[in-house]
C-alpha cells in the first residue's frame, strides 16, 4: 500500500513514472526475462485443468466416504458415474501432457531426466519444468527451494528475539504440496531416503522438518541431473 512512499492521489501517469524511475535506479541489477513458449503455455493450461479435475474427484470421493450410509443407491450410482468420468478425464489430460512434452526435444530431455529420480513422476516433473521455465528461469536448487517454500530462514532480531528457523509462507503452495507427495513416495521406494528419514526421526527431529529435508534432497537431485544431463543413479549400498 505504501510501496510508492508518501504519495497523495493515484493515477496511471504517476504509476508509470514511478515504475520507470524505479527501473532506472536499479538498471544495473535488472536482467531480461525470457517469455515461456506456446508449448509451455499449453502445458500450464493442461496442468491447471488437471488440478481442477483432481480436486473435483477428491470432493466426490469424500462425499461417498462420509455419506455412504446416508445416501440412497441412486445417489451412490451417480457419484460413482461422475468419478468414472473424472478419472477418465484425468487420464486423458495426462496423456495429452505426455504427448506435448514428447513434441519438444528440450522438454522431453529434461522430463526424462527428472522422472529418473525416485519420487518424481509426471506431475512433479511437469510442474518443475513449468515453475522454472524448463530450468532457464530458475537455475539453482536453493532458489527453487525458496520459491516453493522449502528453504528455511532465520527469524531473529538483535540479541533478544531468537525465533525458530522456519520456511516462509511466501511460496508456490501447489508446487510445495506436489513435493510433499514426492517426498512421501521417495521415503517408501528409495532405500537411501528411507534410511535418512528413519535416522532423523530416531534423532528426535520433527516429522515436518524431516519431510522438508527430504524435499530439499529431491530438489537438489533434480537440479543435479539437469546440470549433468544424465539420469539419476541410485546408490547400490543403500538399503
Q: Language-model segments: what does each one mean?
A:
Residues 159-163, 197-239:
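Low-complexity, acidic/Ser/Thr- and charged residue-rich accessory regions of DNA metabolism proteins
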Residues 4, 31-45, 68, 163-169, ...:
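Short, solvent-exposed helix-loop connector elements
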Amino acid at each position: 500500500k505504501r510501496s510508492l512512499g508518501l504519495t497523495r492521489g493515484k493515477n496511471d501517469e504517476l504509476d508509470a513514472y514511478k515504475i520507470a524511475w524505479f527501473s532506472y535506479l536499479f538498471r544495473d541489477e535488472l536482467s531480461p526475462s525470457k517469455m515461456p513458449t506456446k508449448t509451455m503455455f499449453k502445458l500450464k493450461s493442461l496442468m491447471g485443468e488437471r488440478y481442477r479435475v483432481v480436486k473435483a474427484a477428491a470432493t466426490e470421493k469424500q462425499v461417498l466416504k462420509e455419506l455412504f450410509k446416508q445416501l440412497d443407491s441412486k445417489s451412490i450410482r451417480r457419484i460413482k458415474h461422475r468419478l468414472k468420468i473424472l478419472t477418465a478425464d484425468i487420464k486423458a489430460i495426462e496423456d495429452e501432457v505426455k504427448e506435448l512434452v514428447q513434441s519438444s526435444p528440450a522438454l522431453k530431455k529434461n522430463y526424462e531426466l527428472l522422472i529418473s529420480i525416485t519420487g518424481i513422476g509426471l506431475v512433479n516433473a511437469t510442474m518443475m519444468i513449468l515453475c522454472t521455465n524448463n530450468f532457464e528461469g530458475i537455475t539453482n536448487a536453493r532458489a527453487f527451494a525458496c520459491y516453493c517454500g522449502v528453504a528455511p530462514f532465520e527469524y531473529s532480531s538483535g540479541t533478544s528475539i531468537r525465533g525458530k528457523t522456519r520456511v516462509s509462507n511466501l511460496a508456490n503452495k501447489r508446487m510445495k504440496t506436489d513435493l510433499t507427495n514426492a517426498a512421501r513416495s521417495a521415503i517408501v521406494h528409495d532405500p537411501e531416503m528411507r534410511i535418512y528419514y528413519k535416522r532423523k526421526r530416531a534423532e528426535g527431529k520433527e516429522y515436518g522438518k524431516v519431510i522438508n529435508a527430504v524435499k530439499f534432497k529431491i530438489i537438489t537431485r533434480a537440479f543435479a541431473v539437469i546440470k549433468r544431463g544424465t539420469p539419476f543413479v541410485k546408490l547400490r549400498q543403500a538399503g
